[in-house]
Amino acid sequence: MRGGGIVFFKSRISAVDPAVARIIDGEVSRQRKHLQLIASENFASAAVLEAQGSVFTNKYAEGYPGKRYYCGCEYADQIERLAIERVCKLFGCSYANVQPHSGSQANQAVFLALLNPGDTVLGFSLASGGHLTHGASVNLSGKWFNAVHYNVRRDNFEIDMDEVRDLAKKHSPRMIIAGASAYSKYIDFKSFREIADEVGAYLLGDVAHYAGLIAAGEYPSPFPYVDVMTSTTHKTLRGPRGAIVLTNSEELIRKINSAIFPGLQGGPQMHAIAARAVAFGEALTTEFKEYIRSVIRNAKTLANVLRERGFDVLSGGTDTHIVMIDLRKLNLKGNVSALKLESAGIICNKNAIPFDEEKPFVTSGLRFGSPAETTRGMRELEFAHIGGLIADLLEEKISTDNAAEMVLDLTSKFNFYNV
């Protein structure tokens, strides 16, 4: 081990720790050679990665710009203020906190800021496409609060707004959550606002999956309808891992800031905030808007190909980057199907579908997403090919080995991270 000096500051991972270097190289190779179709994943730019690995890694900056508990925070203040300015411009809001380490912590901060333990929360059922932090029984949000859940309609698998209203009137929730992790259609934030007003509830919009689409103007904005919006900064925003909390209320941002620090977190990860600032700047460009339009076109192409091949695509298609398929008609399970696709280099995830009778680690569905491979440069032609490969594999019309060769041939044409 090197104690310090010039060598310490110049040594590369490959020289200092070959074991870690080999693992990183292996992951780079995996990302290059496989098709990354997990809806919550994306590829960050080289600029984002550079900021994430910057010397801000070294800096402790407990508190907020202009009010820190440590000295030497001049540049930490500058980068955090820049991130806040950019994200507020991106989503058309007045206030932002860019410090949450994850989407789950962002949601937890809103709970801490606005609720008391035992308060009633109305959220989207995990089984219908919601998220763990929307009141799932295994999550803190379901353990500390009285969680009630709305579902999708059985006829079209879209959010049942009649049920939302009925449950809100019956249970008088302190907060209603509008958001999802496995839902491919538009969310009607205006109707959620009307229901929240009827029962005097806060409205939280958790748009972690849709944030990039919203920023590009290709998905309904939660503002001005929600009281608070949360989102991760990776996924469709194409930034580093982390999260944001946004609002137009000065009163609420004070409560949220206190909930995040000192309520939940200590020092913010300034290197991650620097990377978020870069990602927000990228998302403000016209190039990002065109990228998001391609993301949606590619997802629609994938959904159309799978539907034409006889697969049951939930909701009949997609408005977003997410494509969900129901495998029950083919007598297939999500876990087995996901592993089969992975063996050919197609990476997706097993996913429960609405009213699924299978266990969470089995499931009856698969979830696909288009953001990562769109970032890589693939367009509708490639996604049509990918859809055909998925169908051929699941219908056993092609061997895994042959499919793997075709995947490798495709991915080799779209190389990246050439470092």
Swiss-Prot record:
One of its GO terms (biological process) is tetrahydrofolate interconversion. GO terms for molecular function: glycine hydroxymethyltransferase activity; pyridoxal phosphate binding. It comes from the Bacteria. Keywords: Amino-acid biosynthesis, Cytoplasm, One-carbon metabolism, Pyridoxal phosphate, Transferase. Its EC number is 2.1.2.1. The modification N6-(pyridoxal phosphate)lysine is found at K235. It holds the Pfam family SHMT. Pathway: One-carbon metabolism; tetrahydrofolate interconversion; Amino-acid biosynthesis; glycine biosynthesis; glycine from L-serine: step 1/1. It is an enzyme of class 2 (transferase). It catalyses: (6R)-5,10-methylene-5,6,7,8-tetrahydrofolate + glycine + H2O = (6S)-5,6,7,8-tetrahydrofolate + L-serine. PROSITE patterns: SHMT. It is found in: Cytoplasm. Its cofactor is pyridoxal 5'-phosphate. InterPro entries: PyrdxlP-dep_Trfase (IPR015424), PyrdxlP-dep_Trfase_major (IPR015421), PyrdxlP-dep_Trfase_small (IPR015422), Ser_HO-MeTrfase (IPR001085), Ser_HO-MeTrfase-like (IPR049943), Ser_HO-MeTrfase_PLP_BS (IPR019798), SHMT-like_dom (IPR039429). Homodimer. Belongs to the SHMT family. Catalyzes the reversible interconversion of serine and glycine with tetrahydrofolate (THF) serving as the one-carbon carrier. This reaction serves as the major source of one-carbon groups required for the biosynthesis of purines, thymidylate, methionine, and other important biomolecules. Also exhibits THF-independent aldolase activity toward beta-hydroxyamino acids, producing glycine and aldehydes, via a retro-aldol mechanism. This is Serine hydroxymethyltransferase. It comes from Neorickettsia sennetsu (strain ATCC VR-367 / Miyayama) (Ehrlichia sennetsu).
